[in-house]
Amino acid sequence: MPSMEVALLNGERAAAAPGLKGECQLCGKPAQAKCGPILRWHWAHAGQRHCDPWMENEGPWHRAWKALFPFEWQEVAAHDAKGEKHIADVKRPDGMVIELQNSPMSIEEMESREAFYGERMVWIVNAEKFRSQITIQEALPNPQADFVADLIFVQPVPDPRTNNVVILGDGQSLMFFRRSDVWPDGKPTYQLHSGRSLGDLVVQNYVGHHLCVWLKPREVWKRANRLVVFDFGGEAMWEACHYGADRLFCVRRVSKSKLIQSLLDGKEPAL
């Protein structure tokens, strides 16, 4: 049964401490502080129940991320106009919600949570479990660069023999078609071009985007409509995104420290 970091004690949010008895901030039912010598201190519903189906069992990854934010932002009860209630992992005073996802999730639940929390929401996903299935490949230019509108980049083919992280970075191994390559009758020629023909344009217009191959992808993160950031465990994190007019699935390098600082400063997520 999922545990809680926060319960209400005499109507005020409180962390667990020995001997305390409080109330669940979502449903108002009794909550008991669990403060043993082995597990971290936490709150639990009295009896075998939990009132929020979106909460998951938490491990070290989940707790470490929560601890980066002020206690007042952690496990905040949220309500919508219809009376539906859920507990956001992290919610800033300005309404920005940060959901920390460790376990697999259905597309239906993802869509429900995005609809509930609205557009000001960030998914931070523990991607260490499927890190070996993602190959980060060649760099892409800024999708907003003028010359990119003419290009149709070719997505690499998944190969289980090369499912490790390979970051090249200069664009030379890219392959693409040009929309402007047409026959006199207007039909596309489908002439394939090499990234070498772009010279230094990729390096000069690089803002973190990379092609990637994802073996056995978790489709839920390809279909999410809010910001999704994969945590592989290091300083570099990766935004899961769609590139250009063709919406080619790719990843974008994100600085973990800059992302966290922007969220703490009350700003939009720094990417």
Predicted regions and their residues:
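Non-catalytic C-terminal interaction segments of nucleic acid-processing enzymes
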Residues: M1-G19, K129-L271
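Active-site metal-binding core of divalent-cation-utilizing nuclease and nuclease-like domains
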Residues: A15-P18, G28-K34, W61-S112, K129-P141
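Short hydrophobic alpha-helical runs that function as membrane-insertion/retention elements
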Residues: R120-V125
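Nuclease-adjacent, charged terminal/linker segments that flank catalytic cores
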Residues: M1-Q74, D80, S255-L271
